[in-house]
Regions:
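Short beta-strand elements in bilobed, periplasmic/extracellular small-molecule ligand-binding domains
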Residues: 4-29
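Flexible loop/turn connectors
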Residues: 15, 28, 35-152
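A conserved amphipathic alpha-helix that caps or lines the catalytic cleft of carbohydrate-
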Residues: 3, 7, 61-64
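Short, surface-exposed alpha-helical segments at coil->helix boundaries
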Residues: 1-4, 105
Length: 153
């Protein structure tokens, strides 16, 4: 929802595709269909594609390279989760990463707080879940930074 809210606020045209991708074959087929729709809707325009995980982003990059022999300049691709697939792809994939160290620190703090509350309140259970927001970070790699890489050469 955050992505859609941002696009609406910034008046950025966007589409959301929701498909269950159970295995590699299904993922490839769904991503091929999505790619065809995007290309039909946006000929000659830059296409920013945010994919729900790095594995599917890698499949999408592979489909584009197979089709065009390269990663076209008008495609900017971002995955999610900073998995090894994003770092090891033929074109390293830009990705949104969770800050695992901060998540772990906050989880331990919450656990310690709950243990202390439990000791002090005679075993009263926590009544409401605790929500903490850890801001993810964008790791820029070749699927969004090709213009910058070309300038460096």
């Amino acid at each position: 929802e955050g992505f859609e809210d941002f696009c609406r606020e910034q008046q950025i045209p966007h589409r959301v595709f929701l498909h269950e991708m159970k295995d590699q074959t299904a993922s490839q087929e769904h991503l091929k269909e999505i790619l065809s729709e995007i290309e039909a809707d946006s000929p000659g325009r830059k296409k920013g594609i945010f994919v729900s995980n790095d594995t599917h982003a890698s499949i999408l990059v592979n489909l584009l390279v197979r089709k065009y022999g390269k990663l076209p300049e008008d495609y900017l691709i971002v995955g999610f989760d900073d998995s090894p697939a994003s770092r090891n792809a033929i074109f390293p994939i830009s990705t949104v990463a969770q800050q695992i160290d901060m998540l772990a620190t906050e989880a331990v703090k919450l656990l310690v707080e709950q243990i202390e509350e439990h000791k002090n309140s005679k075993h009263t259970p926590v009544s409401e879940p605790v929500h903490k927001m850890i801001t993810p970070v964008l790791i820029r790699r070749e699927t969004t930074e090709r213009d910058l890489l070309a300038e460096d050469n």
